[in-house]
Amino acid sequence: MAIKVRFFASLRENTGLDHLEIAANDIVQQGIATAADVWTAATRGQPLPAQALCAINRDHAELGAAVNDGDEIAFFPPVTGG
């Protein structure tokens, strides 16, 4: 299986990526991979923007949260509404 990665709004523009899939084996180190590890692998080392947010399987998550094979990770900037 793979980890699905999606980018939204300015993060999509900055990375030039809409979505991709990464083999879980490519990012798992010492048995644990985090959302931040997924960002690093997906963007080939681009710095993670300080205000970036993420969701794992459509639930808000911390960037240090563990990810598993088959998860969907979304990265997006902070948003506000009115």
Where are the predicted features?
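Ubiquitin-like/PB1-type beta-grasp interaction modules and other compact soluble beta-rich domains
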Residues: M1-G81
